[in-house]
Amino acid sequence: MLVLSPSKSTQKLEFINTIQLLGVSYHFEHEIEESLSEIYNGYEEWIGESHNLHAVALSFRLLRQQGYYVSSDVFRKFTDDQGNYNKELVNDTHGLLSLYEAAHFRVHDEEILDEAINFTTTHFKLLLPKLSNSLSMQVSYALKYPINKTIARAATRKYISFYQEEKSSCDQVLINFAKLDFNILQKMYKREMCDITRWWKELDLANELGFARDRVVELYFWSLGVYFEPQYKVARNILTKVLCFVSITDDIYDTYGTLHELTLLTNAIERRNIDAIENLTSYMKLFFTALLHFYDEVEKELEKENKSFRVNFAISEMKKLVRAYFQEAKWYHGNTVPKMEEEYMKNGIQSSANPTLATASWLGMGDEATKEAFEWISTEPPILVASSNIARLLNDIVSHEREIERGDVASSIECYMNEYGATKEEAYMEIRKIIENNWKDLNRGCLKPTTVPRVLLMPVLNLTRVAEFVYKDEDAYTFSKNNLKDVIFMVLDDPIEE
């Protein structure tokens, strides 16, 4: 299909963009890489001639999205001598939307893209009431969930409905294919969910540990945000189970365990020995036994493919996570407000759970996940630190008020206010800046050349996207009966009418 598309660069880019947004690009990964590589090689020549904002912004985004570094200077042709975007651009809604989406792939020292986000966001808010209903919905969705900061399946479900509205440009064959593909995958996800739910019920931890959040469906959706493609069925299964254990661990350390109990559990997990069970309380014995059994089962399965070495890396990250949770518990019980950078943020890399989840996300992946790759991710490379910082801080912002009422450990908000004498609003503003700076680091880490194959970096990026989605305006994981419930229903349970 892709090979038959017109050879002109802009038309090719439009087609690639459409199949990506419709969620079917995973069928054409090789063809897309070939096409974008060809476009990248001749990029400087043809882009210099183009004064079409949509074409320039679209090419910039798709190339960066694929890992190709292209200069943001290409947008200078759309600015005046002071570096401000030309006012007449506001009449080009599609161009403006493309610029907005492209700017979210910015790295450090790209003020022109910082300005692009300010410019497009400001003007879209003014333009919204004047746009057609269909375009207004599309822009509103983009303002809340830009392409680089959303869950692919949720965006696909929305975009299919947007695309159908564009009667003049809608390719009927393509839209029918996208709907069919979405529904086929949805049926597969339902079967996967049945397997996970059966495992969860047999484990019975939700009943035995009544204080813990029972969110197996939400956690499956979380793993689906990391990889939705059919070939990652085993990886999704393992990651969802790890997410279940991480969620329970968080609740034990955050809300239920006494410091003495947590000391014993931390030591038991460090030792990873069933003999350590003797000193634990009854509910911790159940949890600890289930955790050991889970990793043993994964190890046996991976041994069949000579990949059992991966489990030791996953367990090592789980131990680091438990240490980080335990450190937070000690701060809480000691009424300590840690230093923002050298204490809270350093510990927060692990307490975000992203290093544990990123490593676990590779357990069921293909041969690209080598021992060297696992060794690399265990060193906390910059891309993982950025991802973890974003997840940690987003969680802190949306849970801050609730945790103050509950008397939880000091979050980054309190740490910043305490250290810099800032107001709550100033702390929020600064922390949002820190989040955006970490996104720039993350975007940089996804550009070629990369230390490990890009297929391994995608789960790290997608874990961050899930955090952006789940912690957008609220803690949608803890309070999942709100907006998240509707999104999960659309993705997992509501087929598209073909």
UniProtKB/Swiss-Prot annotation:
Motif DDXXD motif, which positions? 250-254
Q: Which InterPro entries does the annotation name?
A: Isoprenoid_synthase_dom_sf, Terpene_cyclase-like_1_C, Terpene_cyclase_plant_C1, Terpene_synth_N, Terpene_synth_N_sf, Terpene_synthase-like, Terpene_synthase_metal-bd, Terpenoid_cyclase/PrenylTrfase
Residues bound to Mg(2+) 2 are D250, D254
| UniProt cofactor(s) | Mg(2+); Mn(2+)
**Binding of Mg(2+) 3: at which residues?**
E403
- Key words, A-Z: Magnesium, Metal-binding
Task: Kindly give the Gene3D superfamilies that the UniProt entry links to this protein.
Answer: Farnesyl Diphosphate Synthase (1.10.600.10), Terpene synthase, N-terminal domain (1.50.10.130)
- UniProt-annotated binding residues for Mg(2+) 1: D250, D254
Write down how the cofactor binds this protein: Binds 3 Mg(2+) or Mn(2+) ions per subunit.
Q: In which pathway does it act?
A: Secondary metabolite biosynthesis; terpenoid biosynthesis
Q: A Gene Ontology molecular-function term?
A: magnesium ion binding
GO annotation, biological process: diterpenoid biosynthetic process
State its role. Sesquiterpene synthase involved in the biosynthesis of volatile compounds. No activity detected with geranyl diphosphate (GPP) and farnesyl diphosphate (FPP) as substrates.
The UniProt similarity line reads: Belongs to the terpene synthase family. Tpsa subfamily.
State the domain notes: The Asp-Asp-Xaa-Xaa-Asp/Glu (DDXXD/E) motif is important for the catalytic activity, presumably through binding to Mg(2+).
The identity of this protein, by name, is Sesquiterpene synthase 15a
Lineage at the top is:
Eukaryota, Viridiplantae, Streptophyta, Embryophyta, Tracheophyta
